[in-house]
């Protein structure tokens, strides 16, 4: 079993999943993973399915050189976006695996949130392409490692309201003025 970059805060309420040496572009997968970070599991799965169907785009923020603009990126408050289909499918597969791990652990699947997702570069695979005049150029691929930690979200308890409203705290000057007014009125 490999090490994760981060361990969950509460191991009993979390589940993990990882994939190594995946033949999918690192840069596209990095952007797609950043888009679904801290999303609820069901929303992340729906988002990735929409990316495959080109109904929602993945915003490209870091690796955005030469990336075209699209109107769907406006909901992310950016202009550049793409639909990395293969990356979305790999992430969906990983989330499905993490979901089955959570189900096995007895966690409530509908309350799971993507607490941690990280994409790292894997060693490049080398191929070759043949050029004019007998030359050979490299034809590299950029695979990646992906790790996901899902955590069951705790229910937020509403703060109890006090019956009597708290009085505003006054500064020393204002307190002094109030005392002077009281003295004058007497």
Curated annotation (Swiss-Prot):
Keywords: Ribonucleoprotein, Ribosomal protein. PROSITE patterns: RIBOSOMAL_L22. The keyword Signal does not apply. The keyword Ribonucleoprotein applies. It comes from the Eukaryota. One of its GO terms (cellular component) is cytosolic large ribosomal subunit. Belongs to the universal ribosomal protein uL22 family. This is Large ribosomal subunit protein uL22.
